[in-house]
């Protein structure tokens, strides 16, 4: 009977014989790696709701200093869930003037309903239909935290507007145009426009803010 050391040695020798002539490249390893499984939209919504409840419990039990930390954590968790969790699921969903679908990838969605649906699914206590039909400024005012203001820009070129928004810092913002509304995502100075686009392919897109056709065609209101 072979001893354990001999078995290990035989295994090592066998592995050496079967080894390729050269180690795999990073590209080969990437191709061989299984694609990560993305959580479903429903799972993202449920996970965010669970996180929100846990944070609310900590907020209720904590003192002033702890409350500030929890609020900062909640803000970061919400931003991350919106940008990396909820919004990506909607990419490619068709736009329509009267689109009201509640599920990404099915039916059609109008720009206002896209914003209101995302906000509702993120945990905001809003009336989806009313917000979906409301003016962008009304949505902005209703979702702006106390002590914060709605930034307003008029007659400004897309590139300059992108720089002004980037100066506000990383995060996710709601932007209202004269005939349109959507989200602006800022990360490391990169400014993206995520919206149910009524131009070009007419689907939900994530595109460079300054180059977005909808920005070019619209006068920013806030």
Q: What name fits each language-model region?
A:
Residues 3-10:
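Sec-dependent signal peptide recognition
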Residues 14-16:
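C-terminal motif of bacterial Sec signal peptides marking the signal peptidase cleavage site
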Residues 19:
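Short, conserved catalytic or interaction motifs in soluble domains
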Residues 23-137:
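N-terminal capping segments
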Residues 97-101, 168, 205-210:
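N-terminal post-signal-peptidase region of extra-cytosolic proteins
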Residues 133-205:
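...with weaker cross-activation on analogous glycine-rich loops/strands in unrelated enzymes
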Residues 208-222:
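Glycine-rich, aromatic-bearing surface loops/beta-hairpins
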């Amino acid at each position: 009977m072979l001893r354990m050391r001999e078995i290990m040695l035989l295994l090592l020798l066998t592995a050496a014989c079967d080894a390729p002539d050269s180690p795999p490249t990073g590209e080969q390893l990437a191709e061989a790696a299984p694609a990560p499984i993305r959580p479903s939209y429903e799972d993202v919504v449920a996970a965010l709701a669970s996180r929100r409840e846990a944070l609310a419990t900590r907020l209720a039990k904590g003192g002033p200093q702890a409350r500030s930390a929890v609020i900062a954590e909640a803000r970061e968790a919400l931003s991350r869930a919106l940008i990396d969790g909820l919004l990506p699921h909607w990419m490619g969903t068709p736009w329509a003037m009267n689109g009201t679908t509640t599920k990404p990838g099915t039916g059609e969605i109008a720009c206002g309903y896209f914003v209101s649906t995302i906000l509702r699914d993120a945990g905001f206590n809003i009336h989806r239909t009313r917000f979906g039909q409301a003016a962008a400024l009304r949505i902005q005012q209703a979702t702006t935290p106390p002590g914060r203001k709605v930034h307003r820009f008029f007659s400004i070129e897309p590139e300059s507007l992108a720089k002004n928004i980037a100066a506000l810092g990383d995060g996710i913002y709601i932007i209202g145009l004269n005939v349109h509304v959507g989200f602006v995502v800022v990360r490391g100075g990169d400014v993206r426009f995520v919206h149910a686009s009524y131009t070009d392919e007419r689907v939900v897109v994530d595109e460079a803010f300054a180059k977005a056709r909808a920005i070019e065609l619209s006068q920013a209101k806030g």
